[in-house]
Regions:
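Residue-level recognition of single "structural anchor" positions
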Residues: 1-178
Length: 178
């Protein structure tokens, strides 16, 4: 589904272990210990997945990406209806350039400093949605990073029809599928 943002918007990222499921490996199997410091990368079989929550409409989006950088963040936030969009983030450095852009009003919380909520600024909805997405992916016991979108689309649909009455849920499913 296309991302359409009214605002204000929460955005957060999480990383999923997703490799080359169903294809030949070009290296030895990875060890179970933490081998590298830092965040995951698409090339390192731990692609970033962005969670966006539009507080204005209640819509939630889960979008896998090749990289977690400023360009990706700008691309995700580009489909907005208003000129200036309020964005709630955590302290991840890819969101820092939004402070200098007049198209965005950024408010952030720094988890590293023990700050999780500051007035309306929090990303708790994104984090809870990311937790549900991880639970959704876990029974698949390994996901191909190239097909991560295909695994997350049914999750988004399921969350969209959650607690809707039968007919309304069925109409939503038909609209999404067609």
């Amino acid at each position: 589904p296309a991302i359409s943002l009214v605002g204000p918007v929460e955005i957060d990222e999480f990383y999923v272990s997703a490799g080359k499921k169903g294809r030949e490996r070009d290296r030895e199997s990875r060890s179970r210990a933490l081998s590298k410091r830092g965040r995951g990368t698409y090339e390192g079989d731990k692609p970033p997945v962005f969670t966006l929550v539009d507080r204005g409409t209640g819509q939630r989006y889960v979008v896998p990406a090749k990289s977690a950088d400023e360009a990706t963040v700008r691309l995700l936030l580009d489909n907005r209806e208003k000129e200036s969009l309020t964005v709630y983030t955590d302290g991840f450095r890819a969101y820092d350039p939004l402070d200098d852009d007049e198209s965005f009003h950024r408010e952030s919380v720094i988890h590293g400093d023990g700050e999780y909520v500051d007035g309306d600024a929090h990303v708790n909805t994104c984090e809870s949605h990311a937790s549900l997405a991880r639970r959704w992916l876990s029974p698949h016991r390994g996901v191909s990073k190239d097909k991560l979108t295909a695994y997350l689309r049914p999750f988004q649909l399921r969350r969209r029809i959650f607690r809707k009455p039968g007919r309304e849920a069925l109409k939503q499913i038909v609209r999404e599928v067609l």
